[in-house]
Amino acid sequence: SGRMGVEGFCVENMTTTSGTKVVYTGVPGAYAEAAMDAYFGSEIDGFNVETFGDAMEAVHSGKAEYGVLPIENSSTGSVNDVYDLLSAYDNHIVGETMIKIEHALLGLPGSRLEDIHTVYSHPQGLMQCSRFLDGHREWQQVSLQNTAASAKRVLDDGDMAQAAIASKQAARNFGLTVLKERLNDLDNNFTRFVIISHKKIFQENADKISVCFEVPHESGTLYNILGHFIFNGLSMTRIESRPIQGKPWQYRFFVDFNGNLREQAVRNALHGIQSETEGFRILGNYKGVEPLY
């Protein structure tokens, strides 16, 4: 039912088959794979790439129909690289999902906590377990691309003095032993992942919209722009700013708010914002998930 929404978006329900290609970052056992499984189930053809940029490129070029990328963590905040990629690529957010992050310390079978002197993880993994790591100041902390790659590194190196901070699923995938569970500083640590597509589609029941825009550097500008949400009775759920490369002191804003592209209030607000900003883009309209606490 290709009914038009706004800005060339049209209503189309997402259908997947066992042949639908979905890309995620990291190696099997990464939280992104868990997010993909949670959103799509097993009836797809998932594959992994190394970086967020590679995933965006795969979706843009058509190698993958959908991509799964982390956008925000409940304890350590935004995944800045992904915000930058959303503005750089002509891809769209078509869904989101939330994954509970439960970090464990993984070592080789037979290794013991007291033998460890090097620990690998993603920088966010190290940050989210800082309280635990503070108790082991003598350990060398090494940042790698993602948590699952860290687990793989421990397996490949075969060194009893090395450990990784990753999921228990990664321990199963790589045949490692869980030396200690529940390392996170916070019990309720979640990462929100967005589902990306090159197609400009939104589902009939979509209730969350993401936009980005650049604001000319004048006082009061952002205030005026945000006024469009308020006047039209729309509630913002998130606002992020990122510096714009090559434009000192200028920022690109990312705003999430509740609504559907077919609603008049939404169209009014977007029209107003577009007229007062540069580089305005609707990143997507999708079904939001409730935060898990």
Where is each model-derived feature located?
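Domain-level signature for soluble enzymes in the chorismate/prephenate branch of the shikimate pathway
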Residues: S1-Y293
